[in-house]
């Protein structure tokens, strides 16, 4: 039976700063699990399989089965419902909250964080399997049980038409279909296995233009595997890393997630690396193309992209640029004497790869550059210590649920979820009943703050200050993020106001000052906050965005979510420490509020870039402005935002927004105008902050009724459609949101609507 293990090391090649706090890995143990537990696991797997086309999102049931046995909760209060025409009583809200928090406390790990699924994208696992296959360690890293669960996941998320999407809820794409088909073949599935599934997948590929029409990232992966020629790729010259930093196009000015992906890609491209040509590779050359491999026009293939994948079409200037680099630049740098510069650039790239690896304890900023960096380390030296240090950290990215084993979009969302969970529980004004839960969470948050900057000259490594920040996941990961720092900061400040005998000692003031310093350092000149770093270049650089599948990825843009979170954190700090950098903080808050007003859409909404979508962005927009001192009566932006949200409430009383809002940038209801507990929570929080209860509380009562009646018998809330997003077009799972935001919204509703303003 599979078991989720928390904060464990046990491998001599693992490095850690804090005894692996937050680490979550799944291990298979054939000697555990009662017959009843094993039967329950098989039952939920079968249920997912039988309903996979109607309900594409797993509900993290394997973790729930394990924790139900390990963390038995107190006696569950009887379930309550609100009938039509019935007024909502404070008692029913309180019972719902206690049931919800009692259940959610059982999902907390012993180190204080809440583990959960952070999967969703369908293009991550292929990179891992391709890399393991090339480097010859597939069977070392992945046991037969791992392979079985990965295959289960891939088959479960194959669409009816035979293809695979960019993410679990998306329509079939060439990128998703080719890579997942290849992954299954590398895992040992035959070309006609899967009860016809492989044949359907292959037919989808051939019917839609064949693998020559895969996206640029797909072309790169197929090229290193040996199923595509490098001449069919647009250039990624490593020499760009030797350019003067003053140039706007220097890669050090890119958004760090893109920079850290194109860094190892440029190494592999610069070396034209190709893995061993195995019988499976030779067979794939026949399976995924519609003409014989040796007859493919690779130059034409460079710019081919299936229409199903084309979210960001290449502008003409980009095609001219790639053609120039391909026909002029590359022939020069592949031969002496210019080849000397190529070799120098490759050495520079590897220095940056090693710096990234070492400063994330070989976790890396994300799963794409994790496996690419690992492959580059192997290409540089197959017997290197760096390659061996990479191997055990692969398991940090693997998550298991009833739909199978997936690769997550990070090594988890540990800090992010815990910071929100703390704020949600405290909002209920019932915190004294959940002291042990909050104490453990407080300990986790104190253990997860980044305590040092990266070593060396930060400018030379294109890094921002880190000391005092909070990461998205774990301290071992360590990359600082503006909104994660702000949300973590808000949570520890709220905890500091509770009795220390209940929640533990507060964070030392010096570490709070470090957090303030990070937040202030991340504000751009326009008042907005980006994610990891300052915005370092210009939006016109999107003209050279080579990733057809993603939008707005080349630079680190300022976002309403990050800007609002910074306002909230600085305001909370200012109230507790009014003398520390007072004028700087006040000036920062005012600039940030003006930025939020400036980027509001004409319909009153804000576009959410990290959650689905306008309900998420508008919650942050309203919250930021209210925290900065604006009110409904004094601020037209807040009035417009409230009108927008109220116009989107559906007949059931809730809100339900489709992921299509993200990619199309137009508010789109869920199919059938259904509600979603997470969207409903966000909208409620926004409207409560904007004083909706003082004007007309009816919309809030209707929404609260929806949340109360959505609660499950055990106190959990249902997993509904996917609610996270990145790069405008790819969705990602936040499994904890279904618990956090109903608790938070009902907590605020209980204290600020039913009980009235304090």
Curated annotation (Swiss-Prot):
Coiled-coil ranges from the UniProt annotation: none
Q: Tell me where the PFTB repeats sit in this chain.
A: 147-188, 512-557, 589-629, 638-679, 700-747
Q: Where in the cell is it found?
A: Membrane
Source domain of life is Eukaryota
Catalytic machinery residues: 483
Q: How does it sit in the membrane?
A: Single-pass membrane protein
Q: What Pfam families does this protein map onto?
A: SQHop_cyclase_C, SQHop_cyclase_N
Segments crossing the lipid bilayer: 122-142
Keyword list, A-Z: Isomerase, Lipid biosynthesis, Lipid metabolism, Membrane, Repeat, Steroid biosynthesis, Steroid metabolism, Sterol biosynthesis, Sterol metabolism, Transmembrane, Transmembrane helix
Q: Does the keyword Membrane apply?
A: yes
Pathway annotation from the record: Secondary metabolite biosynthesis; terpenoid biosynthesis
Gene Ontology annotations for the cellular component aspect, listed alphabetically: lipid droplet; membrane
One biological process term in Gene Ontology? pentacyclic triterpenoid biosynthetic process
Name any one GO molecular function: cycloartenol synthase activity
Primary localization class, coarse: membrane
Reactions the enzyme catalyzes: (S)-2,3-epoxysqualene = cycloartenol
Say yes or no: keyword Repeat present.
yes
- What InterPro entries does its record include? SQ_cyclase_C, SQ_cyclase_N, Squalene_cyclase, Terpene_synthase_CS, Terpenoid_cyclase/PrenylTrfase
Q: What is its EC number?
A: 5.4.99.8
The top EC class is isomerase
Report the sequence similarity comment from the record.
Belongs to the terpene cyclase/mutase family.
The role this protein plays is: Component of the phytosterols biosynthetic pathways. Oxidosqualene cyclase converting oxidosqualene to cycloartenol.
Q: What is this protein called in UniProt? A: Cycloartenol Synthase
Q: Which organism is it from?
A: Panax ginseng (Korean ginseng)
Q: What is the lineage of its organism?
A: Eukaryota, Viridiplantae, Streptophyta, Embryophyta, Tracheophyta
Gene this chain is encoded by: OSCPNX1
